[in-house]
Amino acid sequence: MGRGRVELKKIENPTNRQVTFSKRRMGLLKKANELAILCDAQIGVIVFSGTGKMYEYSSPPWRIANIFDRYLKAPSTRFEEMDVQQRIIQEMTRMKDENNRLRIIMRQYMGDDLASLTLQDVSNLEQQIEFSLYKVRLRKQQLLDQQLLEMHSRVCNKRIYRFSILPYLIHYIEIIKF
């Protein structure tokens, strides 16, 4: 019968933690050695203890420094470091391409550069322009409705004001007549 799983959490007792680290470190290095022998793999393991002490293992005949150098020179995109300048150039190129694409679209919206478009492209462009025109007209109508409401409100307020002071005006006119 196998052992139960150990709950993975930090061991609070420093002595127990150090003993567990030592045993598990030895087990890890043993597994690395077995993998190197069985699969003829170049393996390097670097482990730092909780106190900062470094332990390392490298599969014979390699040294850890050789394996680490090989790791740094690996042609994988995960490990390659791109030069900052190269990244900036790539981003600038991407942005220029995007800018050119958007300029072409804008010229097409303005009715220019249509010669390169297919019938389907022209139909799609027409639908997009019609939809844009619909949205513009809808917004225009909203603004006109808003202005109409504001003007109506002002007229009503002026009428109320006139009617509220009308009795006083009539009274003063009658006083002036006498």
UniProtKB/Swiss-Prot annotation:
GO CC terms in record: nucleus
Pfam family, one: SRF-TF
CDD domains the record matches: MADS_MEF2_like (cd00265)
InterPro entries per UniProt: MADS-box/MEF2_TF, MEF2-like_N, TF_Kbox, TF_MADSbox, TF_MADSbox_sf
GO molecular function, one term: protein dimerization activity
Annotated compartments: Nucleus
Domain K-box: 85-178
Residue span, MADS-box domain: 1-61
GO biological process terms, semicolon-separated: positive regulation of transcription by RNA polymerase II; regulation of transcription by RNA polymerase II
Keyword terms of this UniProt record: DNA-binding, Nucleus, Transcription, Transcription regulation
Function noted in UniProt: Probable transcription factor.
Protein name: MADS-box transcription factor 31
Underlying gene: MADS31
